[in-house]
């Protein structure tokens, strides 16, 4: 998965680097941190390694069991990292200094998405943050077409075939 996402999403590694840098502004001693849609736990590992001396509590949430197993294995040496195999919407969040979400909200039904954002906001400590990276729709059809074309060109440059790109696009219809 890690290889796939880096190949499929432009600037994916950069988004992790930026979130790591921004995290310094929001984390006090013993902060709670949630990574929503943690997949293989790579970001949690990087964040917990960066903050070894601060005794934070890290929670990775993903509803895909196989991802959680990889995330647990990847973070097994850090007792402060907990991986939860649950739907994000079902988790009762503790008061939190930082939420991160990397290209996850697009997979939550739009009817439930706003309720989740409200729940996140209510769980934030004063001065806390949600660092969110997400695919968005352009403000008009012409710019959306341009963005889609550039994105498809990027995927072709990464070695995906036009059939693979079309298949992925069809699989996401009705979700995004």
Predicted feature descriptions by range:
Residues 127-135:
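Conserved beta-strand signature within the Rossmann-like core of class I S-adenosyl-L-methionine
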Residues 136-176:
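C-terminal alpha-helical "lid/dimerization" subdomain adjacent to the S-adenosyl-L-methionine
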Residues 11-29:
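Conserved alpha-helix/loop element of class I SAM-dependent methyltransferases that forms part
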Residues 103-106:
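Short catalytic micro-motifs in class I SAM-dependent methyltransferases
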Residues 90-94:
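Short conserved loop adjoining the S-adenosyl-L-methionine
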Residues 114-126:
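A short glycine-rich, Lys/Arg-flanked "PGG" loop and its adjoining helix->strand segment in the class I
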Residues 34, 39-89:
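Class I SAM-dependent methyltransferase SAM/SAH-binding core
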Residues 100:
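A conserved beta-strand element that flanks and buttresses the S-adenosyl-L-methionine
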